[in-house]
Amino acid sequence: RLRKPSTGGAGRRSTEKYLFAGIVPAGRMYDLCREDLRINFHTMRTGIFYGSTTGMTESLAAKIAARTGVAQTDVHNVADASADEAEGYDLLLLGSSTWGCGELQDDWYDFLDALKRKALSGKRVALFGCGDSASYPDSFCDALAEIRDGLEATGCTFVGALDAAEYDGCTSRICRDGKVIGLAVDDGASEAVSDARMEKWITAVGF
C-alpha cells in the first residue's frame, strides 16, 4: 500500500526514507528536496552584524532586516557587539562600509579579530556593504573581501555571491571567478538598481 510522505516539516530524513523506499515518483524528488531545504533554512536563526560610520551601512542593515524578517534584537552594531553573540546564529549577514584603500570600517577590526578565532563550521555567512565604484574602482567594497579572507579558516560556508555581470567592469577584490562575493551597494547607482541587486542577493542567500 502506498504511503504519503509527511507534510509536517519532519525534515530531510523523512524525505530520504520515502525516496529510498521507492514510493516517491521520480518527478517529485526535486520538489521534495527543495521543500526540505526550505524548511531547514527557515528554522535557521539569522543574525545581522554591521559596522557603520556615516549611517549608510546601518540603514542598509535595517532594510535587509525588514525585507528578510530578521528581528531588531538580532541586528547588531559591531561597535557594541561581542563575537560570542555570533555563535548563537546559524546564518550571519555581515556588513561593512569601505574606507581608505579598501579598508574595513573602524569598528570591524576588533570584532573581526575576535570572530576569526571562533569555530564557525556549519554556519553560513553572507556579506553586504556600501562603496563608491566611480571614485574607488580598484577598491570598491573591498571591506567585504577583508571580512571574507579573515574568516576563510573558520570553517564557515559563504553564500550570497552575485553574477559579476551585475557590476560591469568590476576590478576590485570582491570580484572573483566571475562572481561578486556579496551585496555591494554603489553610492552612484540608482535606488532601483540597488534594490534589484539586493533582491537578487537575498535570493542567493536562500531566503
Predicted regions and their residues:
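Residue-identity detector for glycine
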Residues: 8-11, 22, 27
